[in-house]
Swiss-Prot record:
Binding locations of substrate: N265, G322, I323, V324
Any Pfam family matching the protein: ATP-grasp_2
EC number of the protein: 6.2.1.5
Role according to the record: Succinyl-CoA synthetase functions in the citric acid cycle (TCA), coupling the hydrolysis of succinyl-CoA to the synthesis of either ATP or GTP and thus represents the only step of substrate-level phosphorylation in the TCA. The beta subunit provides nucleotide specificity of the enzyme and binds the substrate succinate, while the binding sites for coenzyme A and phosphate are found in the alpha subunit.
Protein name: Succinate--CoA ligase [ADP-forming] subunit beta
Similarity comment: Belongs to the succinate/malate CoA ligase beta subunit family.
Amino acid sequence: MNVHEYQAKQIFAEYGVPTPKGIMAESVDAAVEAAKELGGPIWVVKAQIHAGGRGLGGGVKLAKSLDEVRELADEILGMTLVTHQTGPEGKLVQKLYIEDGADIKDEFYLSVILDRKLEMPLIMASTEGGMNIEDVAENTPEKIITVPVDPTIGFQGFHGRELAFGLGITDKAEQKNIITFAQKLYKLYMDKDAEMIEINPLVRTGSGEFLALDGKMGFDNSALYRQPEIAAMRDLSEEDPDEVEAAKYGLSYVALDGEIGCMVNGAGLAMGTMDTINHMGGTPANFLDVGGSANAETVAKGFEIILKNPNVKAIFVNIFGGIVRCDRIANGIIEATKITDVHVPVIVRLDGTNAPEAAEILKNANISNLIVAEDLGDGAAKAVAAAKGEI
């Protein structure tokens, strides 16, 4: 789960992570009132969407008067902001963050993420603040500093010193400031079950202080039950409506840009299914994991969500029946076709408990667009052929 910048900075404040003062606004008048309350004389008007690259997209602008605040708020609020992370469709700006201007001497990049290879949190930093970190990693990887932190000992002084030296911070007082800053950020990361904290840019002021000029946070969905105050920050309007709808039925759905809809139980099998479709010359239209609940209702909802995509020309159902028997899944698929109008070929591969009986049930159902596959390769090949109109 992601949160807006203004929400991330509220959490930063709880842990004493310094940020400029700011106020969220949902209207032009509220933006002007926020600027008055902050006092100025310089403000930054920021679009609030769940995506990076807002500045380059025209969603972050400087105002030097209240009239400019009004003008920029009117321009940004309600716009569809397109960035390298939103895709060409962009995101509608419904909230603004009005923030005090800052005295910027230098800009850095700082983040805390989970390194899955090292199996521990990783502090990542760079002197190239304000830039797309992916571009820095590709073009000048030597400018990225990585400091792994073993969670059994936590963030220690030597971690902070390694970070400070790597960023070229030599002044003793400034070294102390950046170490304290990183220490607070790491504690926040651990306490709140965060998956990612990113500050870009982290700025050094003329007085040697460090401020989080931006703030992005992502959280582990599986841990939200013990972070109710974080869960309450969820903004469903920023999420894909089909993904939200799928989650209500216990389905994990991610839209892709192919032509073959996929319905699979288990994330690993789902990824393997998509790889096999690609190997056979097709392109998956989605990732859809029905988990262990492949009954008529969930399968019908899965069909409904998949078929919202007008590009889908075939559906490949690939289920391994372990706890749930294949014959029950087969009956569920047949019932689902009665609930939802499935107007494209559906290729079904079932394996596991009672798989032979399931195949007979499907064949005897006499549903013209239901095709039974022998195995994964056969199913993927038939799905690709069906999408091309060859079967």
